Amino acid sequence: LNYPSLRQAVVPGDRVTLVVDRQTPQAETLVLGVWSKLEAYGVNAEDVTILVPAAITPGGNPDLRRLLPAGVREQIALKTHDPTDEKSLGYLATTTGGERIYLNQDLLNADLPILIGAVGFDSVLGYRGGGSAIYPGLSSVEAIRKSIGQGHEELAPDDARPLRQMVDEVIWLMGLQYAVQVVPAVGDGVSEIVVGQVDAAFQKACTHLKETWTQPTDARSGMVIVAVDQDANGHSWFQVGAALDVAR
């Protein structure tokens, strides 16, 4: 979508960094799919790094290489960003608001960064997705700390929000272009996958998200009853709280 074929964006010898958002459903399957394309276009496994943003809440780190062939799995690096390690950060640029932006070196040094992430409603950002897996999750402790706050109850998801504007500016400054945007379905399923230029893919995924996960009503309900049709395996109270927050 609004971007040349991946075949035209990469050549043998390029260093490729796959940034995978922690909330992405079927992430291992998506990593396998992206790798199969990269391999077909001559990219070496040892030139590929899978980079996971820092965790704001406690949780495990599944091996996103699990579905890759054994030989490939051993060659592709899997790293979780540590914002406390200042040596892992590099200076990107200064925003129009005077904010100095630091990002993970593996991301900055990549010839081709590819973003794989879920799109969803977010009380602070409006919509999670696009570059929100990169900033602040692949930045400094200070950047992550500044991003944590209460949602904007007075704003609708499509309204302008300061952090969303910051995220979009950071993505523009680093020149990131290629993204795989995922709209979640029930459970760990996938409703839609949009691949292409990051802004176009994000906007199209947001449109599908609204069509799939919103239910217009004539009046505000006084009570909502929610049924959970499966156990809590893979879920946490953080996700429950986030769902309640965006539903306010």
Regions found by a protein language model. Give the residues of each.
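Short internal beta-strands
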Residues: A45-I56, K79, Q181, R248
